[in-house]
Amino acid sequence: MRGSTFLLLSIVGIYGAILNAAAWSVNNFLMTGPKAYLTYSSSVAAGAQSGMEECKFQFGWERWNCPESALQLSTHNRLRSATRETSFVHAISSAGVMYTLTRNCSLGDFESCGCDDSRNGRVGGRGWVWGGCSDNVEFGERISKLFVDALETGHDTRALINLHNNEVGRLAVKATMKRACKCHGVSGSCSIQTCWLQLADFREIGNYLKMKYDQAHKLEMDKRRMRAGNSADSRGATAETFHHVHSTELVFLEDSPDYCTRNASLGHHGTEGRECLQTGKNLSQWERRSCRRLSTECGLKVEERRTEVVSSCNCKFHWCCTVRCEQCRQLVAKHFCARRDAAVANHTKRRNKGHRR
């Protein structure tokens, strides 16, 4: 039993150690465990990894940028937290695992799973019927739940929050699914369509959950009942709090720090030394403001550094059949957050106190 538990804890890639390239090798944790776990473990690992990569993309220009040290979410971790950021990590990891299991099921990677054809032949709407090969999200949801939710063995508030946010991630996969259709009819008239459901691009799920992160709900617990030491009273307070929370809403318990300052014990690296964006093509308004958010509002200055970038250029096709390119060097201006005079920095941070992350 302990071996199976260790496999579950190891395989779900929401721990910092798992993000290490060497530790990420599936072979590292296929030493034990039931056959069912061995069947799906590589998909679970790949799904958790894709969730972490999406987290880093979504928070790339935020003060908290999804660092590896912040992803050690074991409920047995003494430093575990229940912040807004933790809620997103649980949701995106859970979504990544479900997404990959569902996709690999449709690709025929598992003997025990195939398309969801349960609705095939039924009328779906005016001019179309269910058919084709719908992605089997019920399968992905069921297996991902076995792996991801097994991390939470406790019954305390933090464990319940983590389980809730795991479910938000799984519901996000369902909420973003797309209907795809194929036309049928004489001479391409499309008099009737056959339609099926397919997974959205994972980036869309990331965007959806980022929106949920921005709208996340802070739980206000009855602290007197929580401190009373009565487990039944504590469970009652928790149940009452969750009664008003929607199933698709991310929740958190603790306010986040400003993430400006380095705190090694908590795994916060601060923003000093981080790159930020000021100029460039196709930058969003949020990206253009990254220097203000990461530097100015954190009491740092923006420092421009010129970096040499080497790229292939002047490529030509030679018969037959190679492409030869030259190596071009170009100086590119990049901007970084740097320390400024202490007095100026303290004045700036006081002035910007209260700004949103």
From Swiss-Prot:
InterPro entries: Protein_Wnt-8A/8C (IPR034312), Wnt (IPR005817), Wnt8 (IPR013301), Wnt_C (IPR043158), Wnt_CS (IPR018161). It is found in: Secreted, Extracellular space, Extracellular matrix. One of its GO terms (molecular function) is frizzled binding. Its main location: secreted. CDD domains: Wnt_Wnt8a. Pfam families: wnt (PF00110). Keywords: Developmental protein, Disulfide bond, Extracellular matrix, Glycoprotein, Lipoprotein, Secreted, Signal, Wnt signaling pathway. Belongs to the Wnt family. The keyword Glycoprotein applies. It comes from Gallus gallus (Chicken). A lipid is attached at residue 187 (O-palmitoleoyl serine). Ligand for members of the frizzled family of seven transmembrane receptors. Probable developmental protein. Is likely to signal over only few cell diameters. May be involved in the regulation of axis formation and in the rhombomere specification. Residues 1-16 form the signal peptide. GO terms for cellular component: extracellular space. GO terms for biological process: canonical Wnt signaling pathway; cell fate commitment; embryonic hindlimb morphogenesis; limb development; neuron differentiation; positive regulation of fibroblast growth factor receptor signaling pathway; regulation of canonical Wnt signaling pathway; regulation of fibroblast growth factor production. The gene is WNT8C. It comes from the Eukaryota. This is Protein Wnt-8c. Palmitoleoylation is required for efficient binding to frizzled receptors. Depalmitoleoylation leads to Wnt signaling pathway inhibition. Proteolytic processing by tiki1 and tiki2 promotes oxidation and formation of large disulfide-bond oligomers, leading to inactivation of wnt8c.
